[in-house]
């Protein structure tokens, strides 16, 4: 199958078959990551600009490593050392970068939908590394790969997501991707952090309690409280939040005995999850990070038209 998209902005835009292709390619890319010399010439001569208007550790570093392992030239730009601090608009920044002839711009931005705007302004490929509360497609893909690693499939699974659903781009990408692949999504969180109409996104059930959501779940994905996106306080305090929506050694038993626990990071230990669960046998958090490099290699590879991976 040929991947025909110039950009990867949202999993909503991709078909089930296209998602399967990206995951399959990522599985193959892991072989490169297991070598002593972790580099192939696939994107030699290509230039990738990582343009991050929001802070990031895992995603930015992972995209940089992914590009370098495919032999691309990678350039990192942060707002603190860009012309954005002098009032330059996103459109002008994009046009100036485009004049330097990059092949791919990987961007993270606080405004939802900013990548669609950027895509209309530039001719190179755009990959969304997170836009506001809209989507985070690479995180959704790496989560699906991590789940598939354990169960060998994605269809027929009960996936619980607990936390700040309203402000979570990870939640939206996972809902879009996992429901297309046949999983059932169960959501739990404070009513102030649950978006109205979220059930319309697919096979989604909003639960009144955390227990209802994670009861007999195959996968439990805990989400961070997005305080930087909340215009006002949406909960009394973190202790109260943890009491009702934190994952601990007792309530993790509500899920299936072989259930996997995941978190997109960064983790607030003692709030979303106790250290016992973070570091426990059911935790696949570091596996998510590991899979992130392979998934982002696959994304870069396909928006550049594919080719041979040697």
UniProtKB/Swiss-Prot annotation:
UniProt xrefs under InterPro entries: Asp/Orn_carbamoyltranf_P-bd, Asp/Orn_carbamoylTrfase, Asp/Orn_carbamoylTrfase_sf, Asp_carbamoyltransf, Asp_carbamoyltransf_Asp/Orn-bd
Binding positions for carbamoyl phosphate per the UniProt entry: 58-59, 108, 136, 139, 265-266
GO cellular component: cytosol
Entry EC number(s): 2.1.3.2
UniProt KW keywords: Pyrimidine biosynthesis, Transferase
Enzyme class name: transferase
Keyword hit for Transferase: yes
Residue spans crossing the bilayer: none
One BP term from GO: amino acid metabolic process
Gene3D superfamilies: Aspartate/ornithine carbamoyltransferase
Domain of life: Bacteria
GO molecular function, one term: aspartate carbamoyltransferase activity
Residues involved in L-aspartate binding: 86, 169, 224
Catalytic activity entry: carbamoyl phosphate + L-aspartate = N-carbamoyl-L-aspartate + phosphate + H(+)
Pfam family, one: OTCace_N
Associated pathway: Pyrimidine metabolism; UMP biosynthesis via de novo pathway; (S)-dihydroorotate from bicarbonate: step 2/3
Family to which this protein belongs: Belongs to the aspartate/ornithine carbamoyltransferase superfamily. ATCase family.
Protein role: Catalyzes the condensation of carbamoyl phosphate and aspartate to form carbamoyl aspartate and inorganic phosphate, the committed step in the de novo pyrimidine nucleotide biosynthesis pathway.
Assembly mode: Heterododecamer (2C3:3R2) of six catalytic PyrB chains organized as two trimers (C3), and six regulatory PyrI chains organized as three dimers (R2).
Protein name: Aspartate carbamoyltransferase catalytic subunit
Originating organism: Trichlorobacter lovleyi (strain ATCC BAA-1151 / DSM 17278 / SZ) (Geobacter lovleyi)
Gene name tied to this protein: pyrB
